[in-house]
């Protein structure tokens, strides 16, 4: 859910004739260095390009890329500053808005993240990632009606969205609508092995854990234990499965 968006600056000189070749070369070298995980070198190239043409409107791309580099280095405040500088130049740049929103969310600044995702949706109303992430924030903030609205909008655009369906099932569970939650999860699990969906074993394990959580809430502990066993069989790294199983064991003492 927290994907980095890196705006690659690979446009040719014919597309942007105003660029000097050196500016273009520095930008391309920054991309190449980033792809090779030479982040400090990439940052150096970007800073040189910015100094060379400080008024260039396409510096928005460079600032956005710089923010992503800084984020990968865990220099979060500097990354926020870079994303904001990008948006000062290009306020409607969706990649920069998405990057900043994801970083705000990572830092626990949910309201600021929600604002940026909302700005994205004002520009591009069918942006599926923005809908998904805003729904997630609304759910965390217990704004369940708004969360449901976003999940439903997302599922109209992408009916088979794994994260959208799982998110809606989680929302139904939080509202105590256990049968509705089970209906969604049962349908997703029943599709296992079908041509319509190609999920990983880890994704299926998450579904079994999610269903076990609903069954636990419904006091159907035997069913929950069966689903937890299946989840662990599919993916032994499912921490949540062990936690729920431990809770069930404790409740039976």
Q: Predicted segments — roles?
A:
Residues 65, 99, 133-136, 167, ...:
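Canonical tetratricopeptide repeat
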Residues 54-57, 91, 125, 159, ...:
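Short coil turns that delineate tetratricopeptide repeat
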Residues 35-36, 72, 106-107, 140-141, ...:
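Register position in tetratricopeptide repeats
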Residues 23-24, 57-61, 94-95, 128-129, ...:
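Helix-start (N-cap) detector for alpha-helical repeat units in TPR-like alpha-solenoids
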Residues 10, 18-65, 72-77, 81:
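N-terminal leader/linker segments that initiate helical-solenoid repeat arrays
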């Amino acid at each position: 859910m927290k994907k980095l968006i890196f705006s690659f600056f690979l446009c040719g000189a014919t597309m942007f004739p105003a660029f000097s070749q050196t500016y273009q070369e520095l930008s391309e070298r920054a991309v190449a260095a980033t792809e090779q995980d030479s982040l400090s070198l990439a940052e150096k190239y970007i800073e040189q390009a910015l100094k060379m043409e400080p008024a260039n409107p396409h510096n928005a791309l460079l600032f956005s890329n710089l923010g992503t580099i800084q984020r990968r280095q865990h220099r979060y405040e500097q990354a926020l500053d870079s994303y904001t500088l990008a948006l000062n130049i290009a306020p409607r740049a969706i990649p920069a808005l998405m990057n900043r929103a994801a970083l705000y969310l990572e830092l626990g600044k949910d309201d600021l993240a929600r604002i940026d995702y909302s700005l994205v949706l004002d520009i591009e109303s069918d942006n599926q990632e923005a809908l998904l992430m805003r729904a997630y924030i609304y759910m965390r903030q217990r704004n369940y009606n708004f969360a449901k609205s976003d999940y439903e909008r997302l599922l109209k655009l992408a009916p088979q969205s794994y994260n959208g369906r799982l998110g809606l099932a989680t929302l139904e569970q939080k509202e105590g609508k256990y049968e509705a939650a089970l209906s969604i999860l049962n349908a997703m699990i029943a599709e296992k092995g079908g041509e319509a969906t190609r999920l990983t074993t880890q994704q299926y394990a998450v579904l079994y854990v999610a269903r076990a959580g609903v069954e636990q809430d419904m006091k159907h502990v035997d069913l929950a234990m069966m689903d937890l066993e299946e989840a662990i069989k599919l993916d032994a790294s499912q921490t949540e499965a062990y936690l729920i199983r431990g809770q069930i064991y404790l409740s039976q003492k």
